[in-house]
């Protein structure tokens, strides 16, 4: 299996548990929507790493892994000099860090975050599956209408469930660091169109701030209206290039369009 796809599937695995045969029950997002209330307020703090303490764990967050055979990236709260942030380190590894959360993208369409890339694996390229690593990614998982899934996507859900006993979300957007691809480049995963990568910029050594309209990006990437967001995560990986990567992540929040 493509290691990049395996990583994203593992994100879905972390979001959900076992379920029955109906296709909608094979979506991790179905259970999350049933379990969680939509976040309210003027601003949704999806990740408040700055409120933590260096060396402690981030409440409500957990790791998702590529496979039992893949080495795992490390995530820890650290002091950055300007506050506490989450640091991800990969050494030929590929795993991420996530939390389950329910957000209405129509009410809070704008995502804001910052990251600082400190080390990049050589030879990465998000447009080439065999080199699709990134020192920094922000991952957004969505619920959706299972009836819209085509035969291939349904087969992928059932196969994944049969092999692992776990589930995937309906769709995923990955906001990715890249130095060689133009900002705004959208790349579909080579195995499923329900995973789309959007390049947001490059740069090494300095903090970069980002703002994206998730509602507009979803429409552009998938050609349909998004349902609720059901998960937010980050990922620092070097599993394809077998190199080293290191990045720091600041807080992640959602707000209405100004």
Where are these regions (language model features)?
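Extracellular/luminal beta-rich ligand-recognition
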Residues: 133, 143-190
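Short carbohydrate-recognition loop motifs
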Residues: 73-96
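Extracellular beta-strand ligand-recognition surfaces/modules
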Residues: 25-30, 135-138, 195-200, 204-242
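Extracellular-facing segments of soluble proteins and assemblies that are Gly/Ser/Thr-biased and enriched
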Residues: 107-157, 161
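Extracellular beta-strand elements of beta-rich domains used
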Residues: 49, 210, 232, 252-254
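Extracellular/lumenal carbohydrate-interaction signature centered on repeated Trp-anchored short motifs
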Residues: 100-111, 202-205
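Extracellular carbohydrate-recognition regions
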Residues: 22-68, 151-156
């Amino acid at each position: 299996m493509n290691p990049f796809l395996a990583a994203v599937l593992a994100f879905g695995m972390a979001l959900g548990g076992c379920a029955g045969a109906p296709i909608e029950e094979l979506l991790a997002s179905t259970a999350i929507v049933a379990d969680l209330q939509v976040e309210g307020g003027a601003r949704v703090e999806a990740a408040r790493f700055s409120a933590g303490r260096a060396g402690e764990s981030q409440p409500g967050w957990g790791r998702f892994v590529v496979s039992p055979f893949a080495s795992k990236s490390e995530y820890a709260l650290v002091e950055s000099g300007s506050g506490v942030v989450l640091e991800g380190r990969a050494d030929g590894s590929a795993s991420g860090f996530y939390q389950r959360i329910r957000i209405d993208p129509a009410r809070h369409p704008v995502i804001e975050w910052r990251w600082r890339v400190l080390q990049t694996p050589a030879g990465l390229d998000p447009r080439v599956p065999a080199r699709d690593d990134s020192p920094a990614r922000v991952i957004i998982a969505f619920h959706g209408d299972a009836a819209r899934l085509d035969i291939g996507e349904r087969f992928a859900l059932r196969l994944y469930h049969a092999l692992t006993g776990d589930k995937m979300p309906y769709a995923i957007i990955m906001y990715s660091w890249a130095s060689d691809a133009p900002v705004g480049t959208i790349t579909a995963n080579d195995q499923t169109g329900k995973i789309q990568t959007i390049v947001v910029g490059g740069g090494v050594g300095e903090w970069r701030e980002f703002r994206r309209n998730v509602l507009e990006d979803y429409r552009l990437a998938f050609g349909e209206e998004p349902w609720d967001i059901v998960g937010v995560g980050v990922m620092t990986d070097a599993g394809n290039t077998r190199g080293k990567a290191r990045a720091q992540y600041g807080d992640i929040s959602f707000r209405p369009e100004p």
